Amino acid sequence: MKSVQKISETTQDRILEMDLSAELKHGVVVSNLAYDVAKELGLGEKECYQLAIAGMLHDIGKLKLEGYINGQEQNPMVIEELKYVRMHSTLGYEILKDQGYSDYVLESILYHHENFDGSGYPSNRSGKDIPMGARILRVCDVYAALSMDRPYRKALENDEVLRLMIDEIKNFDMQVFLAFQRVIHKGGNYGIKKETSYRNEAVSYTHLTLPTR
């Protein structure tokens, strides 16, 4: 079975050269959480592993928006809701599509901002028309974004994060959300160890291998 040895050297170097330590940390948190949620849902090890890869790379499209995003850091608007930044999931797909990643990984990244009720982007998919990997990333991405410090606001307490997510439950697959809740209530640590630098954590992820099919 053909495998990808690692993200291409060019892509890896671009990730590590970016002054986006918060984005790197966000990717690690989403990756770890997505793996555990997939496990909780009973998915096989191959799918769980591919979800970990997709979680780490889900925002890689922001590489092409880096200058714009950095210029918006003092803007009180929520960056993820700016129309221009909504291109990042499609851009991420374009960056990775010729690098040997499986359709599972690519579609999870492309559709990770689709909402279960059809109100998301880039294609306004709804329900089971959204790939399972993307439905898992959707929940994990929102949780990680709300529970971590971001350029435009401080991290929220865990109870507040869960309350806000429940208020927006229409965005999520209920089966996935309930599995996510079970994982969170088990008390897993989805941050990065204090003694581990973001760069070192990113290097360990960018050398992961995965089957293309």
Give the label of every model feature segment.
Residues 205-212:
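Conserved small/polar residues in nucleotide/adenosyl-binding loops
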Residues 2-202:
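Histidine- and acidic-residue-rich, metal-dependent catalytic cores
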